Swiss-Prot record:
Chain residues that bind Mg(2+) 2: 226-227
GO molecular function: anthranilate phosphoribosyltransferase activity; magnesium ion binding
Gene: trpD
Pathway(s) annotated for this protein in UniProt: Amino-acid biosynthesis; L-tryptophan biosynthesis; L-tryptophan from chorismate: step 2/5
The protein's name: Anthranilate phosphoribosyltransferase
Residues annotated as binding Mg(2+) 1: 93, 227
Keyword Metal-binding: yes
Subunit and interaction comment: Homodimer.
Enzyme class: transferase
Function: Catalyzes the transfer of the phosphoribosyl group of 5-phosphorylribose-1-pyrophosphate (PRPP) to anthranilate to yield N-(5'-phosphoribosyl)-anthranilate (PRA).
Keyword Hydrolase: no
Length: 337
């Protein structure tokens, strides 16, 4: 495509695109007007140089313009990760989302099938009985009645099908690995956002601020997890009241025992679904601890807990009282209605 060639030529020299140039270039990519060779060369040129913040904002703008939107109540948040950490861990953010919603914070969760593990959010939720691919009206009902919905990325970002074959052929991470988490169809302004590399935390937090988010914790575990981990400390870059601050979370300071990395490894969707149900039914496992800790952080991001200690207590109570299990049961029922 001739109109795409100037953008390809510019990134091939190592120069960065402006925000508007990036938006136009990605609009071409998402429209299916670009050949696989052009798309692959463009994405790898960005990857080798490293994507600039304005390029990410522009690309996200192009994807957001094409996405199928969902109406969400005020104060709704997302708990999401980039994936790609190659940990094979349990579905931590999914269980944390259920617990958070049971505490009264609406969670408009956005996700997909597995990226680097054997079970992504969509995979485990399907194994739990949640119906995927709902339309915006049905998702709004899930939020209203269960306090939680799952927006299947394939349904809301159909334009990404044009680059899917290229991403498979490249076989490596590209900017599209982080675009999905930046483009929540419900337009939430609060996120607990896990990244696969510590170097991404501050740039992506600033990108989310540019895109309209007001409260964000971007996290990266010392073990490489794109979650708040319980095997050691987690680095946090937080956006609060228009300012960026950095701090570290140590699970031991919150009364949680350190886990071994193998304690957090999941398996296939059915195995992970059974482990998730066991936690909601009262099992005291490392999976419970890491999910409670991440839910606690989500409660702080949402303004529903003053600090992590209060958040841990609220999240644990939601599990122990059966409220979290009831939230999952409602989500299954409403999504299948």
């Amino acid at each position: 495509m001739d109109s795409f060639k100037p953008y390809l030529a510019k990134v091939a020299t190592g120069a960065a695109l402006t925000r508007e140039e990036a938006r136009t270039a990605f609009d071409h990519l998402l429209s299916g007007e670009v050949t696989h060779a052009q798309a692959g060369a463009f994405l790898m040129a960005l990857r080798v140089r490293g994507e600039a913040a304005d390029e990410i904002v522009g690309a996200a703008g192009a994807l957001r313009e094409r996405m199928v939107r969902v109406a969400a109540p005020p104060g709704a948040i997302d708990i999401v990760g980039t994936g790609g950490d190659h940990s094979g861990s349990y579905n931590v953010s999914t269980l944390a989302a259920i617990i958070t919603a049971s505490c009264g914070v609406p969670v408009a969760k956005h996700g997909n099938r597995a990226a680097s593990s054997r079970s992504g959010a969509a995979d485990v939720l399907a194994a739990l009985g949640v119906r995927l691919g709902l339309d915006p009206e049905a998702l709004a009902q899930c939020l209203a009645q269960a306090g939680l919905c799952f927006m299947f990325a394939q349904t809301h970002h159909a334009s990404m099908r044009h680059v899917a074959p290229v991403r498979v052929e490249l076989g490596t991470r590209t900017l599209f690995n982080v675009l999905g988490p930046l483009c929540n169809p419900a337009g939430v302004s609060g996120q607990l956002f896990g990244v696969y590399a510590a170097s991404l935390a501050e740039p992506l937090t600033r990108v989310l601020a540019d895109l309209g988010s007001t409260r964000v914790w971007t996290v990266h575990g010392s073990d490489g997890l794109d979650e708040i981990t319980t095997t050691g400390p987690t680095a946090v870059v937080a956006l609060e009241d228009g300012a960026i601050r950095r701090f570290t979370i140590d699970p031991r300071e919150l009364g949680l025992a350190l886990a071994a990395p193998e304690d957090l490894r999941g398996a296939d969707p059915e195995h992970n679904a059974a482990a998730l149900r066991a936690v909601l039914d009262g099992a005291r496992t490392p999976y419970r601890d890491i999910a409670v800790l991440n839910a606690a952080a989500a409660l702080v991001v949402a303004g529903a807990a003053a600090n992590l200690g209060e958040g841990v207590a609220r999240a644990a109570q939601a599990v122990d009282s059966g409220a979290a299990r009831a939230t999952l049961d409602r989500l299954v029922a409403v999504s299948n209605a």
